[in-house]
């Protein structure tokens, strides 16, 4: 199968640094969004390259788990890249990686969160990931609201 890619930009009111730093501390995500029930550190250190995390999520109303490894972090670019190791996504996709980059919004306050998903479907019957993009949009918006309420 051929590798494919989808992405989405989400405008938020929080600063890029604040959103990025919160996102690096994955253990706090369940406080900010109803889509994350928890995130356990299985190997390594929180927010460090090579760390392996077990995400407990609600996607399309269904409980899901995803075992991910942090592959790259760029502090200057406010970027984190994860690779999915185990879970439902690995049952449908040979390759699945996700990258989040947070940039200050040009010409205004706030920021833009860009999610990029790269994947290779196991066969033609497996759906493309456009529906999963909405999950990321909703998570970003809920985390933004949480960060704004925290001051």
Curated annotation (Swiss-Prot):
Signal peptide: none
SUPFAM superfamilies for the chain: Bet v1-like (SSF55961)
Pfam family, one: Bet_v_1
Recorded superkingdom: Eukaryota
BP terms from Gene Ontology: defense response
InterPro entries: Bet_v_I/MLP, MLP-like_ligand-binding, START-like_dom_sf
Gene3D superfamilies: 3.30.530.20
Protein family per UniProt: Belongs to the MLP family.
Protein name listed in UniProt: MLP-like protein 168
């Amino acid at each position: 199968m051929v590798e494919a890619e989808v992405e989405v930009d989400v405008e938020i009111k929080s600063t890029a640094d604040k959103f990025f730093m919160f996102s690096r501390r994955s253990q706090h995500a369940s406080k900010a969004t109803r889509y994350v029930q928890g995130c356990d550190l299985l190997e390594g250190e929180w927010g460090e390259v090579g760390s392996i995390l077990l995400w407990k999520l609600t996607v399309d109303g269904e409980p899901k788990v995803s075992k991910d490894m942090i592959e790259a972090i760029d502090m200057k670019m406010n970027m984190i890249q994860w690779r999915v190791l185990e879970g439902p996504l690995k049952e449908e996709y040979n390759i699945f990686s996700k990258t989040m980059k947070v940039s200050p919004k040009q010409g205004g306050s706030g920021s833009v969160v860009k999610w990029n998903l790269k994947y290779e479907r196991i066969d033609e019957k497996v759906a493309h990931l456009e529906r999963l993009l909405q999950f990321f949009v909703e998570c970003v918006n809920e985390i933004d609201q949480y960060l704004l309420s925290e001051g």
